[in-house]
Each structure stands twice: as structure tokens, then as C-alpha cells.
Amino acid sequence: MTSIVVAALYKFVTLDDYVALREPLLQTLLDNGVKGTLLLAEEGINGTVSGSREGIDALFAWLRSDPRLADIEHKESYCDEQPFYRTKVKLKKEIVTLGVPGVDPNKQVGQYVEAKDWNALISDPEVLLIDTRNDYEVAIGTFEGAVDPKTRSFREFPEYIKAHYDPARHKKVAMFCTGGIRCEKASSYMLGAGFEEVFHLKGGILKYLEEVPQEQSLWRGDCFVFDNRVTVRHDLSEGEYDQCHACRNPVSLEDRQSEHYVPGISCPHCWDSLSEKTRAGARERQKQIELARQRNQPHPLGRDPRQSTLEN
């Protein structure tokens, strides 16, 4: 099968007409057979999509025809099967939800650090290195020496910073995330909170894995991604993890040997905390998935748990 191109993209840019952009953007995706979810807000665009080489190229040609998006960048990886079930364009208040009024990367942002320069920065003992992703993402891979805030959503990040760090004592802060969007917005928040030197990894972990040879890498483990691959290895090939549809946690090969693992319904992370209502919903969803597989069709029901991660 011809490789499917998976493109992760975002750009903070003022889009006053973002509501009007939704329909032509959605039509461009549909016309070119591109699947996935894109988020539009006044502060910019964010998402991960997949399709043929021609389809992805057509999408970016359309995006870059808008002068505001002419320099939009993206990261690419490849897989043999379509990793998304649907095509969506959603309107949001924020393209990545921090929930703090006034934080605007279009006005204030930290210093971008290229992948080739990242190792030198985070090896500096005076630099505080923070992983801005969710706890279940950090659990399967992170940079050597990084702090895990143990947050379940990006909304919890500001309170974590307030509770643990002081701008007067922590002079240099470096942050990273999967594709660059969280840490870029986090850098805007940190500067507003009084931190003086704030750095973030340009292009995120995915760009680092793409550009830095594994033998020189300070990355440890797999990287969680927002599609049906669940994780990628250092060479950006698909990892060994699955994802629990009930709790969204990545599920390792070892986890899948557990008596508490029931495909699509529960895993060792959530088996003792699910309500019967949640279990019943998961059972019905899994039933529909199996029926769709038997018919060789995409799964038609329920939202993909990976899609919601874009917003958290």
C-alpha cells in the first residue's frame, strides 16, 4: 500500500475571520481525501491530518495561499494505513486550551531553540527543563532530566507552575511538547508570570526525532502522537503501544498481558475506577468497532480518543 502522509501543523496568527474560514477549509480537506481534525480560533490553527502525498500538498497549497499562513510549517511522518476515521474542522476559543485570559503567543513568546541546539541547552545545569505534556504522554517517553508536572490536561499547567516555581530563583526555563504548540503557548504564559529567560523546542519532539541522530539523542522512550498509531519510535516508525478507549492511557505490550486488559473497555490504568455506565458505553463502542472491521469499514461511531487530545 502507498504510504499515507501524516502532517502535524499549527501556527499562532490572528485570524479575525476564523469562523468564515471553516467551510472552505473543510471542503479543501474533503476534496483532497484528507482526514483528521483541524482547530480554528482567533489565535490561529492547529491539528493533525493525513492523506496521500497529493492530498497533503494540495491542503498546504491552499493554506499558504492565505498571506497570514504563507509560512506555516508542519512535521511529516508516514504509515501504511489511514490513521484517522473522519474529517473535521472545529471552531474553538483557543487552539490549545490553557484557560488563562490574556496569554497570547502572537504578542509575546519565548526563545525558539532549533533541534540541533537543544542538547546543549538542556545539558546546562542552570536550565530547568519542563515537559508540558499530559502525564500519560510523559510516562512512555521524555527527555533525560525533564520534570514531569503530572498534569492530566494543559489547563492544570499554570497552577502547577505557581505552586512549584519562583521567577526569582528559576532564571532559565526550557520547555517542550509533541509538536511545539503547547510549549510555545506555555512560554507566553511563563513570560507573563515574570520568568526572564524562557526557551522552547521549535517543532517539538517530532522535529527533534526527525533531525537528531539516535546515537546523539537525549530522548528516552517513545513519543505519544495524536492518531491511531498512538506512539512513534525515535525513527518515527509506529511504536508498540495501543490506547485504552475508556481512559485514553497508552497501553504497552506488558499491559495487554494483564487480566485487567479488555480491548476497548478497560486496562490496568483504569479497570478499578470506571463506572458501570462508562463500561457499558465502552462495550457498545467496541462492538461497533468489531462490526465495522468485519465489514472492512472505518469505525463509524463515537469520537476517537486521540482526537480530543488536541484540545487538552
Curated annotation (Swiss-Prot):
Listed transmembrane segments: none
Domain called Rhodanese: residue spans: 123-217
Taxonomy, superkingdom: Bacteria
Protein EC: 1.14.-.-
Species this protein is from: Pseudomonas aeruginosa (strain ATCC 15692 / DSM 22644 / CIP 104116 / JCM 14847 / LMG 12228 / 1C / PRS 101 / PAO1)
Role according to the record: Catalyzes oxygen-dependent 5-hydroxyuridine (ho5U) modification at position 34 in tRNAs.
InterPro entries: Rhodanese-like_dom, Rhodanese-like_dom_sf, TrhO, TRHO_N
Family per record: Belongs to the TrhO family.
Gene3D superfamilies: 3.30.70.100, Rhodanese-like domain
The name this protein goes by in its record: tRNA uridine(34) hydroxylase
